[in-house]
Curated annotation (Swiss-Prot):
NCBIfam families: miaA
Primary role: Catalyzes the transfer of a dimethylallyl group onto the adenine at position 37 in tRNAs that read codons beginning with uridine, leading to the formation of N6-(dimethylallyl)adenosine (i(6)A).
This protein's name: tRNA dimethylallyltransferase
Gene that encodes the chain: miaA
UniProt source species: Burkholderia orbicola (strain MC0-3)
A GO molecular function held by the record: ATP binding
Length: 324
């Protein structure tokens, strides 16, 4: 046996929660007490020039504690769960080697699942296949492609809305490249490796005891983003020749709705309402993912002392005062 297989895994604290649950405040509170470096678990924060609509940590916040996996790619590019897993495992090793403590923080549960449970053996993105599907959608509409998906992968089609362009495209792409439905590939055993075996990931979950309070926070935060110049931010991105609404970056919550408004497809009030609704739907999905983790340590994110509670939970994890 190798020395690494005999040694006790290094515990990694993971601060997870839906949007507007107070993750940044809790992470910064921990940074004030311990030499941590924050590794973002957020699929929107990877993009440069998308600051307001992603609620990216401020320049001062990022100066007070090292942050990783923020502003690492251009909005015209894509970033996969596989890339996140490889980057995060590398960063954890580097942070530990520096004698500091990594803290994973974010709300992209697909990334967290890929990190901790491994990856499904799905084919990578193929630009030619995607271009062909985009052309079909432009001609026939996404509901027609949804109907096509229902013929080859009824299980996946049944859980997707007819206009969910990103997921419909990906499911059809997988079938065209592999000859197998995505649902069957996802049901297959995950591809595992020893890369994550050196670590024990412990999730601290910020969850609301009353969703109405979190929904009010979401509305307040979206309005604050609008006041801070979110529409201008999207307009600057829109003026680029290489961006369009079907890119993963522009599908981020809020950006799609702002793009529709700038295209003249909706009025301002409708854009605001749709942006808030989309954020609430994202929050609902994030909470569903969290509640499927029986090992998580739950902190009520709407409690008056939620930051202190989260800080205490994180310190208990890092001090080894949690059950194995």
């Amino acid at each position: 046996m190798s020395a690494s297989s005999q040694s006790r895994p290094t515990t990694i604290a993971c601060l997870l929660g839906p949007t507007a649950s107070g993750k940044t405040a809790a992470a910064l509170a921990l940074a004030a007490r311990r030499p941590i470096e924050i590794v973002s678990v957020d699929s929107a924060l990877v993009y440069r020039d998308m600051d307001i609509g992603t609620a990216k940590p401020s320049r001062d916040e990022r100066a007070s504690v090292p942050h990783h996996l923020i502003d690492i790619i251009d909005p015209a590019d894509a970033y996969s769960a596989a890339e996140f897993r490889a980057d995060t495992l590398r960063l954890i090793g580097e942070i530990v080697a520096r004698g500091r403590t990594p803290l994973l923080a974010g709300g992209t549960m697909l990334y967290y699942k890929a990190l901790t449970q491994g990856l499904n053996d799905l084919p990578g993105a193929d630009p030619e296949v995607r271009a062909a599907l985009d052309a079909d959608a432009a001609r026939d509409g996404w509901p027609a492609l949804h109907a096509r998906l229902a013929q080859v992968d009824p299980d996946t089609a049944a859980r997707l809305a007819p206009n969910d362009s990103q997921r419909i495209q990906r499911a059809l792409e997988i079938f065209m490249l592999s000859g197998q439905p995505m649902s069957a590939l996802l049901a297959a055993p995950r591809r595992t490796d020893d890369a994550a075996a050196a670590y024990r990931f412990v999730p601290v979950a910020l969850e609301p005891s009353d969703r109405a309070v979190l929904h009010a926070r979401i509305a307040q935060r979206f309005d604050a983003m609008l006041d801070a110049g979110f529409i201008d931010e999207v307009e600057r991105l829109r003026r680029r020749d290489d961006l369009h609404p079907d890119l993963p970056s522009m599908r981020c919550v809020g950006y799609r709705q702002a793009w529709e408004f700038l295209d003249g497809d909706t009025d301002y009030r409708t854009m605001r309402d749709k942006g808030i609704f989309a954020t609430r739907q994202l929050c609902k999905r994030q909470i569903t993912w969290l509640r499927a983790m029986p090992e998580r340590i739950v902190v009520d994110c709407i409690a008056p002392d939620s930051t202190a509670r989260a800080l205490d939970a994180l310190e208990r994890v890092l001090d080894g005062r949690t059950p194995d």
